[in-house]
């Protein structure tokens, strides 16, 4: 719906010719040189087949047949696990609800026609306008996520124990998938998501969260029985690791294994000469939040996760 005095707006998937300008619009907050570098890198990734820009949607003034003013852009990337990762729209006017609505409508239509299984969008809690737009178009709020970060200068001592671990490779893939599924049982971390997404799909999604580090994906064991696992990814530009998943099987919970696994991940990140380890946790998962806080993780930001299933 257009506000009084606002021009009508139309939205559509960006054509190949429109993509450079739309990407530049998305990075409009950056200095010109950095902006052009980001656009060039994304276009190069698409050319190499590492990224698809088919989910790039634009919104223009509707009363101009050609060359209308660009009012917003929104990018969605379809992952191999079937998750369409939607990045919040960038608007020329932060209060341009009509453009936000058209961008989400165009994105949703693209998603419904794609091979995606679910669409996910993370937005900051201060973004009330787009939160309302998401709800109005059938997206459900999944959880409040707390994003946390810890530097690696001073770490707790890495305790020696009988716990062993194996890393991810083709021969251990099935065991990783099985153990991942077992850690979902009675989990407090986004249980609605784990109940509908298969462990196989989830593992594939974690691989795409950044630079894949199979040698640092660890499955922990005690006397031959699997305890749980930690999965990390590297964000090279930022010089840090992200703990994309940590999970413990039910019969090993409450025995300090999550702490042991987490401390080892911190030490591994420091050995890799990273500056920090980051993670995101469901705010409702109070035991996990306390564990991270006690280990020195500090809250950076909170975001709301919204989902939509394929219809």
Listing of model-derived features with the role each one plays in the protein:
Residues 105, 125-143, 259, 283-301, ...:
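Conserved active-site alpha-helix within GNAT-family acetyltransferase domains
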Residues 26-62, 193-226, 231:
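Active-site rim helix/loop that mediates acceptor-substrate recognition in acyltransferases
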